[in-house]
Every structure is written in C-alpha cells, then in structure tokens.
Swiss-Prot record:
Keywords: Multifunctional enzyme, Phosphopantetheine, Phosphoprotein, Repeat, Transferase. Induction: Expression is up-regulated in appressoria-forming germlings on locust cuticle. Expression is also up-regulated during conidiation. Residues 109-525 form the Ketosynthase family 3 (KS3) domain. The modification O-(pantetheine 4'-phosphoryl)serine is found at residues 1393, 1506. The gene is Pks2. Polyketide synthase; part of the Pks2 gene cluster that mediates the formation of infectious structures (appressoria), enabling these fungi to kill insects faster. The product of the Pks2 gene cluster is different from the one of Pks1 and has still not been identified. Residues 1441-1470 are annotated as: Disordered. Residues 626-931 are annotated as: Malonyl-CoA:ACP transacylase (MAT) domain. Residues 1012-1146 are annotated as: N-terminal hotdog fold. One of its GO terms (molecular function) is fatty acid synthase activity. It is an enzyme of class 2 (transferase). This is Polyketide synthase 2. Multidomain protein; including a ketosynthase (KS) that catalyzes repeated decarboxylative condensation to elongate the polyketide backbone; a malonyl-CoA:ACP transacylase (MAT) that selects and transfers the extender unit malonyl-CoA; a product template (PT) domain that controls the immediate cyclization regioselectivity of the reactive polyketide backbone; and an acyl-carrier protein (ACP) that serves as the tether of the growing and completed polyketide via its phosphopantetheinyl arm. Lacks the starter unit:ACP transacylase (SAT) that selects the starter unit. Its EC number is 2.3.1.-. It comes from Metarhizium acridum (strain CQMa 102).
Amino acid sequence: MPKLSQQAPLVSSGSGVIASQTFADLIRAALRDILLHRLDLPALVGHLTGIFGLSSNESFVITPVSTNVATGLVAATAKAVGKTGSVDNEIMEAVALAGSRGTSARTHDSKIAIIGMSGRFPEAADLDSFWSLLVQGVDAYRPVAPDRFDAHAHYDETGRRKNTSKVLGGCWINQPGLFDPKFFSISPKEAEQSDPAQRLALQTAYEALEMAGMVPDRTQSTQRERVGVFYGMFTQGGIRAFTPGRINYHFKFSGPSITVDTACSSSLAAIHVACNSLWRGDCDTAVAGGVNVLTNPDIFAGLDRGHFLSTTGNCKTFDDDADGYCRADGVGTVILKRLEDAIMDKDPILAVLNSAYTNHSAEAVSITRPHAGAQELIFSKLLRETGIHPHDVSYIEMHGTGTQAGDATEMSSVLRTFAPDTGRLSNQTLHLGSAKSNVGHGESASGVTSLIKVLLMMKHNTIPPHCGIKGRINHRFPTDLRERNVFIASQPVAWDKPHSGSGKRRVFINNFSAAGGNSALLLEDAPTRQHPETKDPRSTHIVAVSAKSSTALVNNLKRLKVFVQDNIHNLDLLAKLSYTTTARRIHYPFRAAITASSSDQLLQGIESILLRDESTKPATSQKNIGFVFSGQGAQYAGMGRHLFQNNETFRTQVLACNQICLSQGFPSILDIFNQGVEMNNLEPLVVQLGTTCLQMSLVSFWKSLGVTPDFCIGHSLGEYAALQAAGVLSVSDTIYLTGIRARLLQKKCSAGSHAMLAVRAPLAQVHGFFNPSIHEVTCLNSPHDVAIGGLVADIEDLERELAENNIEAVKVSVPFAFHSTQVEPILDEFCAAAESVQFQTQRIPVISTLLGEVVLPEAKAVFGPEYLKRHCREPVNFTAAAQAGKDANIINSASVFIEIGPHTVCSALLKSNIGPNAVTLPSLHRKDDGWKVLADTLAGLYHSGLRINWDEFHRDFESCQEVLQLPSYCWDNKNYWIQYVHNWTLTKGDPPATTAQTPALELPENSTSSVQKVIQQTDGPGPFVTIVVQSDFGSPRLAEVAEGHKVNGEMLCTSSLYAEIGMTLGRQLLEKYRPDLQGYSTEIEDMSVDKPLILKEKNKETLFRAEVVHDKSTLTAAMSIYSVDSAGKKTVDHAHCILRFADPKSWLDEWERTYYSIERSVRWLEARVEQGTDSLLSKGIVYKLFSSLVDYSPSFKGLQEVILNSSDREATAKVRLQAEKEDFDYNPMWIDSFGQLTGFLMNGHDFTEKDQVFINHGWRSMRCAKQFRKDAVYRTYICMQNVDKTKYCGDLYIIEDGVIIAVFGGMTVLPPRRGADAIHTPNPVAAAPAGLVASTKAHVRRPLDIPTRAQRQASSPQSGAIHRILVILAEEVGLSLETLTDDLVFADYGVDSLLSLTITGRIREELDLDVDSSTFTNCSTLGELRLFLAADQKLDDAVACESSNGQHTPQTSDKGSGTLTAQKPDHDTDSEMTLNRVCAIIAEEVGISVEELSSSQDFQELGIDSLSALTILSRVREELQLDLESDFFDTHPSFYSLQKTLRGTEGASNRTLEPNGAIPSRHDLKSDLGNIEWQSGQNIVASAPHATSILVSGSPSTARMILVLFPDGSGSAASYGALAPKIRKDIAVYALNCPWRTNGEEILRLGVSLDQMVAKHLIEVRRILDNHQQSRLNGSIDLALGGWSAGGILAIEGVRQLRQTGIVVQKLVLLDAPNPIGLQNPPPRMFHFLDELGILGAGTGKAPTWVLQHFDAMVNLLKSYRPRPLSAESAPKSLIVYAKDGVCKDPKGPQMDTKPDDAREMLWLLYDRVDFSAEGWKSLVGQQNLVVGVVEDVNHFSMMNPGPKIIEMSNLIGDFLLGLN
C-alpha cells in the first residue's frame, strides 16, 4: 500500500483527526467511524476550530455531501472560531438535478416546477390586485355581499333560532358570476345554471396556462393525453367532479381528472395528488388548485353551530383574541411540471416544489383539532427527504385560521421543528405569516391561496405585513421569538435570495383541515436562468394577439400596449415578446399581428390597429395556400443569406442541394448566398441551379413552419421547383434537370446574343409594333404584360419604338432568350437526358403555365420529358394558367399566395390576373431587409387564419426563448348569477305546509279599476305562483268601458280590457315575485277570445275572474278569464292568453330595424292619396261608417284620420288618445283606439260582403314598450293577409315621434254573419300555441328595378314565426333576443345534443313544426340556421295564419327625387320566414339573441352537439311543421350551408297551422293524479325537479297517435335521438328526460320509489296529451307508451297508473326491455366494463359521471319494484323488440369474467340470446296482447345506433302502432 500524500487534513466525525499513513488504514478508520463509532458533533466542532483557527482567512465554507448537519456545524464552528461560515450545497443540488434529468423511470426523484398561476380572491380579481392587497396589509373582511344572501334574515345573535348564524360578514370575491361562456363554448343558460366555482376554475386555469405559455401538444410534456387536472373542493351543493371535468373537457385533456375533498386542506391535498401523479409518471403536466364560492347561508349556520366561525370579523391569526375563522371565497390554479421538463420546454419557472406530503392527525383529542405531533412529522419528513436543514427555511406560510387551538398547536409544531432554540444565525431569519388574516379562510381554496401568496412574495422579493394581530400576540406563543430569530412582519420586509450557500430561499406552506388532515409543501426559488451570449439577429419581429371575439381582441391589444409602455426600456423586450405571443400562446380567430423593429414602432402598430378597428372579422383557417415559383431575371447576390446564416432548416437544405450539385458534376451554388459576389461574374449554370435550390430550400423552410401548399404554379424556370414541391420530381432529379438544361444552354447557345423585353401593354397593342419574323412572344404574364424575345439588336429597336409611343418596356436581365428559337438547339438532347428521370404522381394540383390548365393529382400522366421539352421552347402563359385556376376554383377568394423566389416578380402578375385584392406574400425581396419581409409575410399568413409552427420559427434563436409575464386574456364577461331568494334555508327541516304559503307582501285589494279584488294568492307548491282576482264588469268604471263599446246594441267587453288586466297582473307578478327581472315588461301572447263577456244591464253585478299561474323557473304565465256566479263558481270561459316577461329594450331594438320599412309603406299610402288612388278619411267619416257595426263612446274615438287601401287590405291612421282618468295601467279604451284600424280596414273595404262583419278573435302578441300618453299623436299602420278562407291576420304598428313603441302582432279577424246571434254565439277559435313570442313585420314597397340578392336579403325582415323560434332558443340558452346575431356559433353557447332536443321539441310542440334535432349539428351558426329556414316553404305554409309574408319597398323615381310612385308591391318569398323561425329556435336554445348569429360561425362553437341538435330540430318540427333529417346539423355544420339549404328547399307541405289550445301547466296536472297509490309520496311527485319532454319526431297537428318513450337507465331522452326521427311522421314521438338526469344521487337520497319516479313522468305525459287534444278538432288522440331497456319497465308502470286516472293507453312498445319478473339487476362492475368499452358514452368515450350515477340509482329502484299484472280491460296491445346479439358476441373482442350464478340480466346483456318467448312480459300484459320482434346483428346497445337496423326497428314500431302488421 502506498503512503498517502496528505493535501488537506482528514477529520473523523468520531475520533478526531485521522493520522492514517496508507489508504488501507484510511479505509479501516472510515469503516470504524461509519459502523462502530457514534457521531460526535462537539468533538468535530473542536477539531474544525483548531484547523480553521490556524487559517488566515476570515471566513470558511462547508460543502455537505449526503448529509444535513452542515448548517448546524457551520453555526457552531463559526461561533467557536469567531469567523464567518457558510454552506455550499452545489454538490447536493447538482446530484439532485442530475437525478431529475434521468429517464422517465426516475420521475419520482424529480423536483416539481410551478410554471403558472392565477386566481380570484376577496377584493382582488387578479394577481396584481391580490399582491397590492397583501403588501398593503389590507383586511378584506366586509358584510355579507348583497348578491349572496340577506345576512340579517339569517342572523340570530342568540344562536338559538334554527338555520341561522351569528355571522354577518366574510371575505367575498367581487361579482363571482362574471364569466365568458362563449369562450368556453358554453351556452349562457348553462353558464348561469352551473356552479360559479366551476366557471372561475375554468377561467383561472386558462390564465394560469397562459402565464405558463402552455400550448397543448406543443412539446412531449404538453400532450393533451398527458395533462391531468386536480382540484380541491369541499362545499356541498356543487357537483364537485365537474370542476376538473369541465377543464379537461374544454381543453380536451385526457389525463387524470380528480377532485379532492379534505375540507380546509383540499387544495393543498389536490396539489400533493398532482405531484404524486407527476412523480409516478401518470401525467406530465398538472393543472391543480382549489375553489370555494359561498352562494348561500346554509353552511354558515352549520359551521357557526360547530363553533368554527368568528363572529367579530376576519381571521385574527396570531392574535390573543382569536375567536374562529372567517369564511371566504377563493379560487386559485397553478400549473405544475417536473423540473427537467420545464427547463427543457423553456417554461417560466416561478418556484420549485421540492416535496409535498399529507397525513392525518389520528392522535388528536378531537377530529376537528390539529395535532402538533402529526404536523411535526410532515415537516421532518420533507426536510429529511430533501436534505434541507430547518435553518435554511426562511419563511413559513402558516395555516393560521385564527382559532385558539389551531394557532397555538401550529405555532408549537413549527417552532419545535424550525426554531427549537436560538441556533439560527443572524442571516437565517424565519418569518411567519398567513394569508387568512388578509382574505379570510377560503376553506378548500385556502392552501392554493397561500401558495400563490408565496409565489408573489418570491416574485416581488418582499414579505408582506401580517395584519392578523389586531391587539396583542397570542399569549400561548413563546415569548422568545426574536431570540430564536423568528419574526412576524408588521411592515413589508425585503426578502432577497441568500448570497451564500445554495443562493435559494426555502419556504414551507402548511395547511390542515377540520377533518384532521395535514398537508404541507416545501418550496424553493427557481434555478437561475442561463442567458445565451448571442443576441437575436432578427431586425424585425412579429407580435401576435388573438381572441375569440372582436371586443376581447381590442381589449387584449390595449392591455399589451400598457405592458409595452411599462417595459419600453427593456432591450430584449421585442424578441421575447414575439416568442411569447406567437410560440407560447393558443391562437383564436380574431387576430392582430404587428411587425416592428423597436418598441416604439410596436406601440405605433398597436395604436394603428385600434384606430382602424381592424379586428371585427374573424380569420378562418380554411385557406387555400398557393406556392408561386418565380422564374429568372430577379436574382441578386446574397439572396436568402439571412436564412442561410440563421435558419437550420434552410441552411441544411441548401447544403444538401449543394452536395447533390457537386455529386452530379455541377459547380457549387454557395456563391449566390455571398453578398460580395457579382452576379454577372457567375455562370448561368450556377445562377439557375442556385435559384432552383434556393426555391426548394424555401419550400422546406415554409413547410417547417407548418405552411404547406394546396397547389403550385411556376413561372418558366420556377416550374422545376414547383414540380418538386408537388411531388412530381425528387430534389436530386430537379437539380439534375435544371443543371443539364443550363449546361446545354451554355454549350449550344451564345450567351448575350438574344434578349427578352418585358412590355407593359396588352398583346393586341404590342402587335402593332411586332414583327413575327424577328420577334417572338415568350411570356403572356397578364392581360397587360407580355415578354418578347429575339436578337439583341431587334429587341433594342423594339424597345426604342415602344418608348417613342409611350409604352413601358424593360429588358430582362437574362443571358438567353428563353422560350424562343434561341433554345431550339438544346431541345432534343435535353429531352433525351430527361428520359432517365422518374416522374412521380403529383400530390397536389399544379397549375401549368405551359398548358394554361390545372393538372390535378388524379389526372393521367402529364409531366414527362416531352412536357419539359415544350416547356423550354413554348411561351409561358401565366394569364391562361391563372384563369384556369379560377375556373377550377383552385384559385378563389380564400387563396393566399406565397412567392417562392428571390423577389416579388409573380406577385404583381397575380394581382394583374386575379385582381388587386389577391393576397400575395413574398419570401424574399431584393431591396427590403429579409427579416422584415419574413415578419410581414408571417403576419399576413397569421391574419389569414393559418396555423403556424412558431416554435420552429424561433428555434434557432435561443436568446428570445423566454416567456414574459404578459397581461392575462381579457374576457367578455357577463354576470351569470342565480340569486339566493326566499330565504329557503331557514325552513329546512320544517314539516311540509298543509296549505300554500302566502308571501308577506300581498297585492293591494283594489289595485286598478280592472283588478279590483284578490281572491287567491299562493306561492307554491314548488316554483308555481297562483293569483286569482275578481272584478265586477258592472262597476261604474268598467261599465263605462262596456257602454262605450256596443256591438249591435250589446255592451260587449273589448279584448283590450283583457290585455290591460294581463299587463296589470304581469306587473304585479314581476314586482312581488321576480325581483331578478327588474326592468322587464309583460307581453300579452296568443289572446284568444272564445265567448264574449256582455254586460246585460248597466250597474248590474257581473262578476268575472282572472287567474294567472306562473312557474318561476320560466318567463311566462298562463292567464284565463271566466265569469263566475255570486258563489264564485265558474260559469263561462271568455278568454285565455299567455303573459311573457321580457326586456322592452330588446323590443325597441328589434323594431328600430323594422321602422324604415314601415315608414316607407306609410309614405307609399300617402302618395296614393296625392295621386287620387286612395282617400283620406276624417274622424267623423270613420266613426260614421263604424257606427253600423260598433257604437263607440267619445272615450274610444281616438282615430283622427285614416288612409285605406282596400285592394291590398292596408291602412294607416293618425291617433290622438282621448283624455281619461289614469286608473289603468294601460287604458283599455286607448288600446282599443289603436286596434280600431284593424276592424275599420276589414269591415270597410270594397270586398266585404253585405251580410259580413269581421270580429276581432284575438292576437298573437301585444307588446307595449312605453306607456301611452293622452297628449301625444301616434301613427298606426297595418296590412292584413288572407290566411284561411275568411280568416285574416296582420300586425299593427304604433309609432310615436319616429319610434315604434308598440306592436299588436298577429291580429286575427273572422266574419260571423251580422246580427245579435253572431255576438252571443261566435265561432270558437282555438288559441295559438302557448308560450310563444312572435312578431311579424308589415309590407314595404319594393322598387320597380329588380333588386340584387344582397338588397333582397337586406330588406327582408324577420317573420313572426322566426321571432317565436328565436324566443324559444333565447329562453333555452339563456340569452336576450337582442344578443342573437347571425355570427352566433351554437357550440360557443353550449347547444349540445340534449339542448338541441329541448329546443326542437319546443318548436314542434309550440309552433307545430317538425324540425330535426340534427339541425344544430348541420347549422353551426344562427346565420346558417336562418338560411336553412328561409329555404323551407313548408315552414311558411305552416304559419301562414300568423303574419304577413314579406315586405315591400317603395318605388323611387329614376331621377332620384324621392317622389313616390304607387306600385303594387311584390311579396318576398316565404323562405326567409322559415329561415328566421329556425334561427329564432336556435338562438333560444343556445341562449343568445338572433343578432349574434352570423354566417361566419361554426355551429359547434356555439355548443351545439348531437343532443342539442335533436332539441332544436324537435322544436322546428313541432312549432314550424318543418321536418328536417336528424343528421341535418352534421351535413350543415355552418350557417352558410344551412342558409343555402333552407332557401333552396321546395315541395314543402301546404298545410296550414291551426292554433292549439293553451298548454296546461304542471300545477294543473298534479291534482288530476291525486288518487294514485303513491299519494303518501305526493310531495316528491309534485315538487321540483320535473320531468321534461322533447318532441323528437312528428307534428302535433297531423299526428294520428302519440308515442311517449320513457328514459332508459341513463335518464336521458337523447337515447332515442337516432330512432325516433325514423318512425312514421304521422306519429308524434316524445322522449322524456328524468327529473334527476344529471343528479342520480338525489334519487337515492330522497328515497324515491319507482312508482313515484313514473308518477313524476306522467305529469309531463298528461300535459302532452292535453295539449294534443286541445289542438285537434275531434278532441282526442290515441296514446302509446314505450321505452328501451329499463324504460320499458317504467312504461308499463305508467300504463297502470294512467289507467287509475281513467286514461287508457292503446299501445305499449318495449325495446329490449329485460324480464320484469324476478329481475336480477347487474352489478356495478358490469356498468364499469361497459363504460371501459365506451358503450355508455354514446360513442364519445367513457360516460360522464352523472350517467353512471343514474344507472346506479335505477338499479336500486328496479331492485325493490314488484310489477303487477294489468287487468284484461287495461292491458294494451304490446310489442317487444329484442336484439339478438350479446355485447360479448365476438370471442376475440373484450370479454367480462362471469360466473353461472351471476345476475340473470347481466348474462342476458353480455351473451347472445336464444329465448325470445317474453314470458315475463306475457304475464303482465297477456299472451294474446303481445307481439314479439327480433332484430339481428345488433346488441342491446347498438340497436339504438344509427344505421339500417334502426330503420328496420322503426318500421316495426310504426306498423305496429298504426295496426299495419
């Protein structure tokens, strides 16, 4: 053994200095110390003191290797030796980092990088305001926010009153309802109904991802399938799984989706789970956080009863008077990655998470009490695992709830671990704090709130003051905190990184929960970023900004402008800003791109865009990219040099081409990239080869950026590179052909003997100077550009002659006259050389400039040696090529051209051929800086909507690759908030009231002259409000109304009085019961007068009542008016209508667009008076003529003058209202005065028969946006249309001071014969469908000149039916009508398959129109839907009775004087009405206004999926009688395609829509079911939620039978979306939705039985049945029930229950329903097996959680259900259709492990069936009543999928129902 040469002393940790002489001795000593001796630190300190004491240095450094004693050792030694000591952890960190950079198998060793964060906090809507709040020490406590609940109503100082608390305040997020649903493709209606915490989680997740610069799928660690989402959420009442689920769904992440509930520590526990997922390799990126939004007082009461909450204010953390915690809102999100992935992806690392851990305080004295030992265990574990000494931790963010027990326990555990004594050095201070003292306790969001606070502290290098100590510090804390170097900041404290040791700050974050859980994180600073020495060489940069709306884009630009102004002196700003805004952002359709070489120039560019408002139109990605390859004559030295020097892709391709050139014997081409070379000194071979290689390298460059050509066109030499880009030639062959041709030219042709002349003139003009014997046309470049070839002398002579005639001509800088006789010597040899080249089939179209044709890939071989031979000799016909491209639609308005060449030669030619608007973009430019050219071109491509690979663009410039912390996305937020009302939590647990509750604020007993006495006023059950009022028609004031309106001597009640009563009651309903509808007005819809109310004698008591029923979950109420006797018993029904509540501003906005057409019609009538065609009738004449029909009192005589056009049934009048007492809301005499024009028009025109009188039978809608004034002068206008024999309809417009203020829409008159009998027994008229809003527009004169299509579209108004559909759509989605525009994308507003079903179902039911639910799949925008509807004649025929069918536009004189010439107008086609109606349905279902729909949008962006499409089509079918295919939205995905289809639809049915009766409310129907056996559970049946239905197929007005399908185990009507539309159209098919479709757990919680479940569905069935019977003349219709799977069992129970109420079900349809006798329900594992196969997810993957929950609930219901046989008289004829196959039919496919004793129904589902006897069903309905059908090649689930088998099954069903089989 050699002796050791001691370079440094070796010190033993046990025995002291080692004096070993040999290596063997040293090893023995080391082993003894390791295995035998104890660690003796005092001895070690003594030895080190001796060594360091001999040194002259004033400081020493200890470097630990795999030990954590270094910090303590330094402290003790420094004290002993009197010198400064420090720890250098470089070795340990290097080892840790090296380990973290290992393979994926080593992910468990990785540190976790935090790369993004965002949040919403009390009084702080963003991170900046949160930091401002923290650093200023703000206490955010305030009284309960008024948008949450009435704090005083739920407050009880004594704490004794049930469901109250002693808390009056908290910490609140301002406006937590703010959300941008369109951005996330959620409908406004769905947004309002979703948990606000989910919405804020979505927005903060996006903002955090944006801060992280995360673009999904950009790198290996950001692949969507490798991103997980983890959130903490504990508050009951929300569906917690949907919080991460919504985020995953929006971003299409498919990694783990987990909600963690550990009460107060939920968010930190969720972050721990996220870290574990990263360490385990389950995901590569994690979105983690927590949410807490306090929406009601419920939990306040419980927590207060548990003594958790402070009653005196905010959390007084560390204060001696701490008395509990303060509840708070909070939402926070962070983005996590493994450190090595974050470094590799150049992510902005905010901090590094060293470790995380969670445990439980099992040894605590109470589950809610923290345990110091458990907390210490976490601290020690994390320190030990990370090798960090406790003294290295400089800040601890405490949980700090402000409870006495919690604060003291936490302080004890922290101090015992991190500062047990005074061992911390002076530079090892430890600060403590808690965010809860500022923003309260966010409960499940508290941990992430603390984490974000710490991240902000690191960013700002400041410890904010702690504001929790209001008086004195907690007396339980140790008094020597300062001696321990522990501080609680009272002012902001600088917090810099340590200069010694690791140079990193270490932080602990502690979080524990009321349920006993403890979670903690150990953080440190991010690693220092290494800045490359090389600067970014690019002189010009591109900055991109995008948004999903124009307003968001403008606001994003404004925010960016402020950011640039604040950072304008940052020298690297522009390059890094370019990288951040391009490569590290998700890009959206509304775009702006600015190119700039300085920050000032960038600011100018932003300002220019904002001033020009260039952001209003979205870009589309459907662009047609053309690569245009220029020829010769534009080459210059150094072309492409900037790319050659700085872009690896371009340079690699150039060098590869150069190598091929050399290998083929050609010279090097690299000289052309040298600016110092003279081009004239390069031989043509080098120039031509170099040009072609340059072009091929540019193609590679563009392709690397994701820009690939859709077609190519090459000019002359450029066609070689074009053929290579199209795949015809390889790179090698392209070089070979170019080189051979150039070499032959040099060899066989004399350079400089010939020349080419570019002439700027048409060929015909040039021919005058052209000599064919010496001149040749070589290029036809454009209609005004030609090139001539010939000998130099001849060309110079021609140039001179042209100049003398002022024709521009320039010699082309080329050595040869290409495409002329000069090249003929090389042709044969060149052709022979080309024979060796293999010409491949092209991949994309090539526009040949030789042939002037488009050569498509499928064309037979065109390119070959002979082609190239001709190409060399024959002229270039660029003009013909461009025209051919246009003719073939290869070149169109969507085309974007990129010139592939050294200069913009072809760009000008393209504009000359195609037009100046052609988008042409250069790759290079002779005069301009290359980087500027490239930036401008990329900006152009970006504006065009192209998806660019920005990472590749920036890849070679490392210095710019830093993600800047830019302002976050600027949302188009609106407030979606459901107000907590009626203080319902106060009565939780109370016994159900035996009578309905009466609200505290009752209607006044004498409200108005028309509403005289309140008879009944109830709020309940459920959402229903009922008001019954009584009035005396013989009372003095109403007798005046009656006496002033005598018909044939009878004092008849005018319908205007009914309208006044409706508006009065509507106002009172809004005031008392709907404070959420402040500012709304009441519209009177579908007023139908059945029998007149007549006052027999003046002053004789004539009692009548008005009854209003309102469902508070809707915007409508039903009103009926009927006479009663003195005992209050109903005697005669007089009228009924619908009250609809709406914002009158939306009416005014709609009418404003109509006013122009109405005003022109009035002027047209006035012109007819001037021409003598029509007469102006005075007031006296009008009422004299009227007197033969109606005897009006002066109060009714408001008409001052009338212009009557009898032939067109059109009139206008001036109205001055008579002075009246103001004792009505809307004076009925004034309303009648306006409406009299209708009666006068119809009874005074030339075609009225002598014995006819037209009587008003109601109207479709009456909307009054403003109060009428007695001193105002009004103008009215109406045009009546014959819709059915003697029935006429029209809209009356009321105008004041140039503004339409009211519209009486769809006024209907019918002509009973004259006489008193006609009055007493008028023809009954059914009411229009309930629940509609419609507004037709009047006719406007059309000019004599045939208008353009654009003019027709511009002047075409919405029809009434369109508007009614829009209202339905707006209601279902949750938008106002004014927000419905054509560019509205249904997918943006959450119109999914279910919502589509709902909308189309309402259209069918309310408008009697058959619209397929797939309309919303085929029509992706409202604009497309409008066009679709406009094309369908069937729609217009169906609603012809409702409105005028077009508009007229006045004829103006040719001289433009404006003089009106009376011309009989043309009517617009009815297709526009159809389109408008469908648009209205879409808008209502999506939840936006019609105006928001646009042809530029895709329906999917509105949120329209298969289910919402079904809903929309259902409503179109029912309301418009328009039958669209169920896949309509699949085949019409955009508004344009829908518009085109609807406007082109012909052959529609000519049937007329007959108005239906009023739809009974659920409140009416419940009483009819009261004698059913489930009466004991009647509260469950009667209360909300309610079953809903969707009319999936058929029409109410034409149906011969109704089939109602009960939901299967999923609870969704969507299961029948494919089947129902295939069933015969004379069967109205309804599908039911379970009331608890998305909340199956409630079924179990409430203990719902199957009987009760069915009874809830039957309320909806009764409503459907009554609606159909009222709409039919014969008053009855056959009913069939049915169901698939478990739905069949529900259906037969429905048959039994309906029979008990006297309703007979004629037919029963069972679709693969399991045997109900002895039912053995499948176990949950089967459903999970099916879910894994994707069966339960309807082809979209795994089923949502709510589907599985509903399945579980149904299994439990069926388990306890015992079916009872039906009696012989009640058993319907029944059909059961079985699927023959089992799910596991394929032996090679997935199989489930089963046993013979497994559940019968499980085996029945999985394996092929052999028994089709249906014995169980026969025992219930009788063998004689049952028909069995079998469908082969389908299983239980696939039988419901689209395809031929579903048509087979639908035929079986249809034939059975109609008795055809």
